[in-house]
UniProtKB/Swiss-Prot annotation:
It comes from the Eukaryota. SUPFAM superfamilies: Bifunctional inhibitor/lipid-transfer protein/seed storage 2S albumin (SSF47699). This is Protein M6. GO terms for cellular component: extracellular region. Pfam families: Tryp_alpha_amyl. The gene is M6. Signal peptide: none annotated. The keyword Protein transport does not apply. It comes from Lilium henryi.
């Protein structure tokens, strides 16, 4: 998993290799889209702050897949 602020786990060599192979332009554009979602989505103001949106990266033998997900902040790692 690649989660912002997650300092609990040292990334594996496979994870580092997969991340280094990612097209940075594509990744930057994806992050820009993610960061604009709360402002552009039709969330009620009180609901907009209770979900975090992130990327899940799965790396398997020369194949990297990215998935968009959201989760309630109450389940974030502290």
């Amino acid at each position: 998993f690649v989660l912002p602020g997650n300092n609990l786990v040292t990334p594996s060599a496979e994870c580092c290799s997969s991340l280094s192979a990612v097209n940075t332009g594509c990744l930057c554009e994806t992050i820009n889209i993610l960061s604009s979602l709360p402002a552009n989505a039709a969330f009620h103001q009180s609901a907009a702050g209770i979900f975090d949106i992130g990327l899940y990266m799965e790396a398997k033998a020369n194949e990297t897949r990215w998935s968009l997900f959201s989760f309630p902040r109450v389940f974030l790692f502290e």
